[in-house]
């Protein structure tokens, strides 16, 4: 792939695309490649939570000048490409994925929590998993878990705050607008990971993002995407 060609219509950089700037994040590039009417941080073919994970990787991979190197650009594009085709999934997939977002041993936010916070997060994750498996936990159970997590959160600091916040905000997925709630849950989970791994630079966040994307695709039973194709990028960016 001739990554230098991206610098003509769009050079990968920290932040979001601004018209006429010639700069944008990797999800802006995916949006452009996919033919969205307007270049956006959340391409139509990509699940919003996964796009948010990749955006954070993009920003952490940027150099001191705000731009991504050719090597970092390729890594970011590979991650972004893995989100293509993930936008449309069932509520069952959403709940199962949130359960993993909270408590997966590899990438769940529970790893940054202690003691009663761990219990509060697992209680909520168990409700999501139950719902994903076809059970219908009573609203009272969701409310009780929400209240318990909020009480715990008031005693915490640092990454643990955002871990528990992601958990209790996710209880609203059962009876409110899914998009806005999922954005809030994902945002808190990302902030949790960012605070807990800030000493490792982008490496750990890239690893977590790969896990998050793999989890989503597995739960949705989506085919494993191929590697990003040079022709797809070159044709889409041909001006």
Residue ranges of model-derived segments:
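Short, glycine-biased loop/turn motifs at secondary-structure junctions and
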Residues: 1-239
């Amino acid at each position: 792939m001739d990554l230098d060609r991206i610098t003509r219509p769009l050079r990968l950089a920290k932040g979001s695309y601004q018209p006429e700037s010639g700069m944008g994040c990797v999800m802006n590039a995916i949006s452009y490649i996919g033919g969205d009417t307007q270049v956006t941080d959340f391409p139509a073919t990509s699940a919003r939570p996964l796009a948010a994970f990749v955006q954070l990787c993009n920003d952490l991979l940027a150099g001191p000048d705000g731009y991504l190197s050719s090597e970092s650009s390729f890594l970011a594009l590979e991650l972004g490409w893995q989100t293509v085709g993930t936008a449309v999934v069932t509520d069952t997939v959403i709940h199962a994925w949130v359960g993993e977002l909270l408590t997966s041993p590899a990438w769940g936010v529970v790893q940054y929590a202690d003691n009663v916070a761990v219990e509060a997060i697992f209680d909520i994750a168990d409700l999501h998993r139950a719902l994903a498996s076809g059970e219908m936990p009573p609203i009272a159970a969701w409310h009780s878990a929400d209240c318990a997590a909020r009480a715990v959160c008031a005693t915490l600091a640092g990454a643990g705050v955002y871990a528990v916040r992601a958990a209790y905000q996710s209880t609203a997925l059962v009876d409110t607008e899914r998009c806005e709630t999922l954005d809030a849950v994902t945002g808190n989970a990302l902030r949790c990971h960012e605070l807990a791994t800030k000493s490792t630079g982008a490496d750990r966040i890239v690893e977590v993002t790969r896990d998050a994307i793999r989890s989503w695709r597995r739960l949705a039973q989506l085919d494993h995407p191929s590697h990003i194709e040079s022709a797809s990028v070159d044709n889409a960016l041909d001006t």
